[in-house]
Amino acid sequence: MPNADRHPASPRLDHCPEGLPKAAYFDAGWYGREMATIFARQWVMVGRAADFPSSRMRRVSVGAASVIVLRDAEGALAAYHNSCPHRGSELCLADEEDVGKLIRCPYHAFAYAARDGRLVSTAHAVPTPDFDPAAHGLRPVSLRVWNGFLFLNLSPAPGDIWADVGLAALDNWPMDGLVTAHHWESEIACNWKAFWEIYSECLHCPGIHPELCDMVPIYSKGVMGASEALGWTPDDPVRPNLRPGAESWTLDGAPCGPVFPGLTPAERAAGYSFVTLWPSAYVVAHVDYVRSVRIVPLGPERTRLVAEWHFAPETLAQPGFDAAKVADFAKIVMQQDGAASEMNHRGMASPSFTTARLMPEEYEIHRFHQWVLSEMEPAQ
């Protein structure tokens, strides 16, 4: 069927554009520019705010920066660069450490107030009058909580959190009250953008995801939604996303607990709602639980995936409830995506490869590529 059968309202591309150059996936200099622009300016998800315990500080990565996130004894969150303003030493040496009212540098014992980062003590050093303690506190990092998720931003003047479908998309889910009950991590040998690319199209679905195509039948056609198909019109009837009898992304399609009561009939019928939060995460809201996935760059050719499953307390209180079993379905899909991303990355290393040529169904990849290039422009 020729692309002329594409409806103007369809998201399909009307041409086959080139992708990013090969250097975008392998070159250390390109990667460094991404860290200095995209990941230094955008809000980066680092987990659920409720999962940061009181009187503890945790070391997290935001692009090229190491950041301390802490919650003090009174429950207040704060974030600072993990670098002592004195001579630059790391402050938090482990993934997580106890913290009281002070953060003390392990090198020269300079002490800083945990709540606001003020320099409190220079320990054995005796500064001269030209040293202003008020100008040498910890360097703060902006933080914001959205739907219970904690985001950090390295920019001195951060803008709003960006979400592809808007920040109100999950308003009918009880997001703030959800509890994290399962955690899964995987390191994959590919560039961080390669995983975003496989997330952004379904041409690969028929060959890579048999279980997912069974759960979401339209994926077996190589499209993410009906509007991508040639011949589609806005007058076509809206059909449920999930196979008959399925209500959620679980191995048997059955809800793992009570369906969230605030959802609209359309949200229940859809079975899932994706929220994309470039560059660091996406959230998938089902009728009975929510999954978050963070994409953490580790280098030009290495990426960490961090997935967590969040449930209502009444779901967790069910006798015999097993969050790991609920997570099994999505783990299958993510492992398949990870293996395919690695396969693609290895192939792109070929001397014969220079750049991709995107298909009309890969409109979301094209949009992502344009976003990456625009965000790498120097700040105005």
Over which residues does each language-model region extend?
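Short Pro/Gly-enriched beta-strand edge/turn motifs at strand-loop
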Residues: 40-51, 122-127, 274-279
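Generic structural signal for secondary-structure transition and capping sites
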Residues: 39-43, 89, 204
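Short clusters of hydrophobic/aromatic residues that line enzyme substrate/ligand-binding pockets
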Residues: 46, 52, 91, 119, ...
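Short, contiguous pre-domain boundary segments
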Residues: 8-22, 176
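Non-catalytic accessory segments flanking enzyme active sites
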Residues: 20, 24-63
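Rieske [2Fe-2S] iron-sulfur-binding domain
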Residues: 51-156, 164-165
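C-terminal catalytic domain of Rieske-type non-heme iron oxygenases
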Residues: 71, 76, 82, 144, ...
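Basic/polar N-terminal segments that are highly enriched at the extreme N-terminus
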Residues: 1-12, 377-380
